Amino acid sequence: MDFDDHDEGDGDEEMPPMPLSSGYDAPMQPGLGGGGGGVPKPGGGVGGGGGGGGGGGGGGARYRECLKNHAVGIGGHAVDGCGEFMASGEEGSIDALRCAACGCHRNFHRKESESPTGVGPAEPSAVSPAAISAYGASPHHQFSPYYRTPAGYLHHQQHQMAAAAAAAAAAAAGGYPQRPLALPSTSHSGRDEGDDMSGMVGPMVIGPMVGMSLGSAGPSGSGSGKKRFRTKFTQEQKDKMLAFAERLGWRIQKHDEAAVQQFCEEVCVKRHVLKVWMHNNKHTLGKKAP
C-alpha cells in the first residue's frame, strides 16, 4: 500500500517546463552534447543547445566578427566592425540570439569551431548562403567558403551568355558569317555603302532591310512610291506669268485678288500654281528684270 501511495504521489507532481533552446536544436538525450545534434562531447558532459554564452554560443562554437552587409541597398559592402558576438539576454531567451554590441542576429557572425581537429560537427544553426542573402548580407570570399557571388548576378550573366550562343548558332545555321551586329562606320567615306553593310549585319537585321528596300522601290526609283506631279508650262505661259509678276511686284496682295483670278482664267493655270511659280522664280527671274 505504501508503494502504491508513493506512485500516486509521483503522478501528481507537475513536470518542470522544458527550457527553450536558443540554437533551435533537436531534443538531446542525457549525456550527449548539444552542438552536434546528438553527438557526444569530447569531455563527456551534458552540453548546451548551441546557445550564445561566453563568445556568442555554446556547443563547442564561438561567433566572431559580424559579417552583415549594411550597404547592400546601394550595391556596396560595409560592415559595422563588431568583433565578437555578445548575447543580449540569458540562455534560452529570444534576446540570446541578438548581439548586444551591433544588434544583429547571431547568424550574421562568423562561426568558429572550438574542436581540436578544427572541424566541428554539423549544427543546424550553421550559416547558409540563402540565409545570408535573405538577411541582406553580401557574400564575401575572404571570410568563409560558404559565401558565393549573388545568385541574381550569375543568373543574369548566364542568360546573356545563353542568348549570345543561341544567336551564334542561328547565324551559323543560316550560312551568315558570325560577325558582331553593328552599324557601318561613317568615317570610311571612300568605301562603298554596300561593302560596309555586307559583313557587319546579321540575319535579324538583313531581313527587315530587304523588306524596306523592296517596299520603297517605286516606278521612278526614288525613296517614295508615289511619283511627284510637276506642272509643265509653255513658253507663252511663262512669258505672261513673268510680265504679270513684275506688274504685281512678285507679291499677291488682297486688293489684287480680282486681277489674279482673271489672269489665271486667261492663262489656264490655277491660283496656287501661279503663287508657287512666283515664289520659286522671285530671286532668279525677278533680279534679271531691269
Swiss-Prot record:
Stretches for region Disordered: 1-59
GO cellular component: nucleus
Keyword Metal-binding: yes
Annotated SUPFAM superfamilies: Homeodomain-like
InterPro entries: Homeodomain-like_sf (IPR009057), Homeodomain_ZF_HD (IPR006455), ZF_HD_homeobox_Cys/His_dimer (IPR006456)
PROSITE patterns per UniProt: ZF_HD_DIMER
Keyword Lipid biosynthesis: no
Sites annotated Required for DNA-binding: M278
DNA-binding region per UniProt: 226-289
Signal peptide region: none
Ranges of Gly residues composition bias in the record: 31-59
Molecular function GO labels: DNA-binding transcription factor activity; transcription cis-regulatory region binding; zinc ion binding
Any GO BP: regulation of developmental process
Localization terms from the record: Nucleus
Biased composition (Acidic residues): 1-15
Cystine connections: none
Subunit structure: Homo- and heterodimer with other ZFHD proteins.
Record note on domains: The homeodomain differs form the typical one by having namely 4 instead of 3 extra amino acids inserted in the loop between helix 1 and helix 2.
Record's protein name: Zinc-finger homeodomain protein 2
Underlying gene: ZHD2
